[in-house]
């Protein structure tokens, strides 16, 4: 009978106790599996089922083939401590069961509970790296199909648009260039060959059908942009230039020898008239005819001259306002002319004469409009230009001056821009300045004998008057006297000193449009004074 020492019993007792404790501690391990289950609920969609459903119990069952059950940390420490005590004691031979358990404990040390917990940061790190990768979620096969379908429908919608012309700004591309990607090629071909259910969603597109990429169909709808108010062509727009076939331009009196002839104002003829001048509505009655040269003089008793003209910076009366138009120009040229007019800060509606000039130059192009605007600005700096004064005021300025004195003023006739008032044989006469195609003249055909500048016309007439009369004037009535015309003494408005109030208004009106005066930070009385007709 074999003897069993006390030390051997103690060792057997300790091993059995640790084995019982190990069996008891196994109950805590399912909590680890539940912890991993929480992570799987968050990231499990990115991995397979085998990785998402991993748990500790499955590993314990696999390890149970080599050992009875897993052991806890406390049981492992106790076994290692007992193993050290065995090596120190070296007394007695351990039992076979205890040796097998020690061998199992040392060999299974890398996969004990402490090492199992180390797998969690490794797995979470892989999840984090996957979550923040450049392509975290792989595209499903349906995504590429949907992309191709959406692009196909978009292209078909663009083809449905209302016939975009080649002049439209847009990127054009053949449909076969759109199919360069292999992912969408098969889907596009299938959509081409497939029949449409509703008849509008799909089109059978050929390979070389041009389509518009990047713009919606409404971007290619052609529409006409309306022009600004006042620039529409007028239907039956009237001309303000006298027709050469008009009977009032035909003279029955032969021209005088020694030069051209001018008609003059005969105040006595008007005084002999019994009928009031307001009856003569026709301009051919109120105006006296020039000779064969076609220069028009104004009658001093004309009914329309009783109404004072407006200032160059004042708009015309509402009942006589003429709508500005550039019907003779193309769309681009009319826009250039209007832009140039606004850029020069000059309003063609400001005065009767200035407004009418724009109608006469509408067929001459924007350069004529620009040159005319600059010429009118240059004219305002001349001393002999008196602006919007009436014929009665002009006669008052020329009352006590010698023959050859003259001044230029705004014409009160709707068909003309400027008028010339001059002295001849002790009388004050008036004639209008013709304008056509950017040229100014005293005669009917300014294209032949005219000047591009009003200042040049007056200066040229002054030089011609040094050697005598450069032309003659006469009345339209047969047998009327003829008067020589000389321009030698310009009457300057700068020679008369006006009040400070008048000069201030003159400067303000030079740099401020009439429609902007109400916006000036001035009292209402001063605004009314600035808006008076004459200055």
Curated annotation (Swiss-Prot):
<dbReference type="GO" id="GO:0035556">
    <property type="term" value="P:intracellular signal transduction"/>
</dbReference>
<keyword id="KW-0833">Ubl conjugation pathway</keyword>
<comment type="function">
    <text>SOCS family proteins form part of a classical negative feedback system that regulates cytokine signal transduction. May be a substrate recognition component of a SCF-like ECS (Elongin BC-CUL2/5-SOCS-box protein) E3 ubiquitin-protein ligase complex which mediates the ubiquitination and subsequent proteasomal degradation of target proteins. Regulates KIT degradation by ubiquitination of the tyrosine-phosphorylated receptor.</text>
</comment>
<comment type="pathway">
    <text>Protein modification; protein ubiquitination.</text>
</comment>
<dbReference type="InterPro" id="IPR035865">
    <property type="entry name" value="SOCS6_SH2"/>
</dbReference>
<dbReference type="InterPro" id="IPR036036">
    <property type="entry name" value="SOCS_box-like_dom_sf"/>
</dbReference>
<dbReference type="GO" id="GO:0040008">
    <property type="term" value="P:regulation of growth"/>
</dbReference>
<dbReference type="InterPro" id="IPR001496">
    <property type="entry name" value="SOCS_box"/>
</dbReference>
<comment type="subunit">
    <text>Interacts with RBCK1. Interacts with phosphorylated IRS4. Interacts with KIT (phosphorylated). Interacts with PIM3.</text>
</comment>
<dbReference type="GO" id="GO:0046854">
    <property type="term" value="P:phosphatidylinositol phosphate biosynthetic process"/>
</dbReference>
<keyword id="KW-0341">Growth regulation</keyword>
<dbReference type="GO" id="GO:0010498">
    <property type="term" value="P:proteasomal protein catabolic process"/>
</dbReference>
<dbReference type="InterPro" id="IPR037345">
    <property type="entry name" value="SOCS6_SOCS"/>
</dbReference>
<dbReference type="GO" id="GO:0009968">
    <property type="term" value="P:negative regulation of signal transduction"/>
</dbReference>
<dbReference type="GO" id="GO:0046935">
    <property type="term" value="F:1-phosphatidylinositol-3-kinase regulator activity"/>
</dbReference>
<dbReference type="GO" id="GO:0050868">
    <property type="term" value="P:negative regulation of T cell activation"/>
</dbReference>
<feature type="domain" description="SOCS box">
    <location>
        <begin position="486"/>
        <end position="535"/>
    </location>
</feature>
<dbReference type="GO" id="GO:0016567">
    <property type="term" value="P:protein ubiquitination"/>
</dbReference>
<dbReference type="InterPro" id="IPR036860">
    <property type="entry name" value="SH2_dom_sf"/>
</dbReference>
<feature type="region of interest" description="Disordered">
    <location>
        <begin position="80"/>
        <end position="105"/>
    </location>
</feature>
<dbReference type="Pfam" id="PF07525">
    <property type="entry name" value="SOCS_box"/>
</dbReference>
<keyword id="KW-0727">SH2 domain</keyword>
<dbReference type="InterPro" id="IPR000980">
    <property type="entry name" value="SH2"/>
</dbReference>
<dbReference type="GO" id="GO:0001772">
    <property type="term" value="C:immunological synapse"/>
</dbReference>
<feature type="compositionally biased region" description="Basic residues">
    <location>
        <begin position="80"/>
        <end position="89"/>
    </location>
</feature>
<feature type="domain" description="SH2">
    <location>
        <begin position="384"/>
        <end position="491"/>
    </location>
</feature>
<keyword id="KW-0734">Signal transduction inhibitor</keyword>
<dbReference type="Pfam" id="PF00017">
    <property type="entry name" value="SH2"/>
</dbReference>
<protein>
    <recommendedName>
        <fullName>Suppressor of cytokine signaling 6</fullName>
    </recommendedName>
</protein>
<dbReference type="GO" id="GO:0005942">
    <property type="term" value="C:phosphatidylinositol 3-kinase complex"/>
</dbReference>
